[in-house]
Amino acid sequence: LIGAISTPAAQAMANATKDIPIVCTAIADFENAKLMNSEAQPDSNVTGTHDRGPLDKQVALIREIQPNIKRLGIMYNSSEINSLIQAENLKKACAPYGIEVVEVTVNSINDIQQAAESFLGDVDAIFVPTDNVVASSIPNLMAVANRDKIPVYGAEAGHVKSGAFASESISFYDIGYRAGEMAADILEGKKTVKDIPVEGAAQSKLYINKQEMDTLGLAVPQSVLDR
């Protein structure tokens, strides 16, 4: 059995073998990544857990804190399929509220500062998806965003720990643990890959960086802080 973390790793392993079971975690979308035709009924040697966060809850959080938001920036590496999917899903989540999503793409960490500066004066907030390039440079992004006191919301708790303002996040521990349980079932002969549908996190949790809240001077509703 092979374990794979992230979409690029899963794709590399899936291309290397069609026979050995592969259990993946932290995959945005197994179908769009061409790992299988149906997450509900895996038809390849791949299964696992996805890391799709609750974008509807993320947008609800942003609107609770910034009810007058009109333009939301998103920065991502366009070569990461998981990031492209998240950008499209964010647009869908924002559309009912008339929030325009402003996209900026980067190729490497060297592009982060310039990309962040393009948001200054143009967006009311920034959303960071589970993107490997951007996630590795959150402090650089924050240094620019804080110049204009632009709140940065992260797709996962790690972004907040790196300096972002807030996140309605899934637990990567939980989806990793569940992938481990799937792997154990396969190794023990209890199930085959095709018996195990792709799963996601059962619940999300709110994370707020209170130091960043003070830096931004944001009046966060008590109802949010009490959650």
State each model region's role:
Residues 1-227:
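Short hydrophobic alpha-helices and adjacent helix-cap/hinge residues
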